[in-house]
Amino acid sequence: KNLLVAVYHEGGRVQRFKDEFTNIPKMNLIGQIYQKDKKHANKIAKLIGWIIAEELAAVDIDFSFTPVLDIDYGASSVIGDRAFHQDIDPISELASSLIEGLNFGGMQSVGKHFPGHGFIKTDTHTEVAIDDRPLETIQNNDMLTFNNLIKIGIKGIMPSHIIYSSCDQNPSG
């Protein structure tokens, strides 16, 4: 096969295929389970990854842009319930489990929205968003989930469409 086919199919409100596909929950539900039972939440994340991989492969989709690695700061309705959690360690752990499930199903993963979209309220599909936080703040918070997943071997990263004014006056993606 010479052509890679990708889709936004992460679960919750960003699930492009619905008919005859498993209804994948929004990722913050797994984060809520994590608060009560980490082991169970990780099993669920892995199973969801496997389901996504198996169902998409059955219709010749090579990969999905998932998981969302953003921190849920409670500010962004665009990210919000798409994020696993508001803390870095649970995000990294649950995303790792989801990726393990994707890989078990023969699918690679693409983490998003580098270097972090959870702090921004603006919908970057309709408006220009600017994150004026110092680079050090972004590096010591938002980027840590990406760094953690890069260390374990995530195969792709999708940038956000945000201007990080402490770095550049152009959008990152």
Regions found by a protein language model. Name each.
Residues 1, 90-173:
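Second-shell residues forming the walls of enzyme active-site clefts
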Residues 1-76, 84-108:
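N-terminal beta-rich core of secreted/periplasmic extracellular enzymes
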Residues 16-20, 75-78, 121-125, 168-170:
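Short acidic, glycine/serine/threonine-rich loops at helix termini
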